């Protein structure tokens, strides 16, 4: 009796890692450009609702734990690395599910982009500032955008999957 080894159902990691690498590259290049061109704390109006700024975030989303004394740098770094490892596992296991994997790759690219900042600088560089009048949304970066878009795609993919199961 002969046994044949079948290919894992998930498929290749390469395309999904490629998406993550593209996110990381664009994120890091934009942060480097903004840090070279703008002074810390400066604000440059681009449109009536949008500024480019240079601010540092030692915390997480919305500056959560930004004033925590330093331990958060390592906690958020560990969380980002753990997320990337879990995402690699999920990408390998579900590699044929295009929307699901695109969402995960965007999240992983964003997480690693911010981990790089934390490791290199001890903070995340944020520079996109949207506002209405005097009210400003917290500044963010391309990594944050990729994470948000990836999360929205995960929700959309799950809603689509549940609707298709009916």
Swiss-Prot record:
InterPro entries: Peptidase_A8 (IPR001872). The chain crosses the membrane at residues 9-29, 37-57, 71-91, 100-120, 136-156. It catalyses: Release of signal peptides from bacterial membrane prolipoproteins. Hydrolyzes -Xaa-Yaa-Zaa-|-(S,diacylglyceryl)Cys-, in which Xaa is hydrophobic (preferably Leu), and Yaa (Ala or Ser) and Zaa (Gly or Ala) have small, neutral side chains. The keyword Acyltransferase does not apply. The active site is at residues 126, 144. One of its GO terms (biological process) is proteolysis. Its main location: membrane. It is found in: Cell inner membrane. Pathway: Protein modification; lipoprotein biosynthesis (signal peptide cleavage). Belongs to the peptidase A8 family. This protein specifically catalyzes the removal of signal peptides from prolipoproteins. This is Lipoprotein signal peptidase. It comes from Paraburkholderia phymatum (strain DSM 17167 / CIP 108236 / LMG 21445 / STM815) (Burkholderia phymatum). The lineage of its organism: Bacteria, Pseudomonadati, Pseudomonadota, Betaproteobacteria, Burkholderiales.
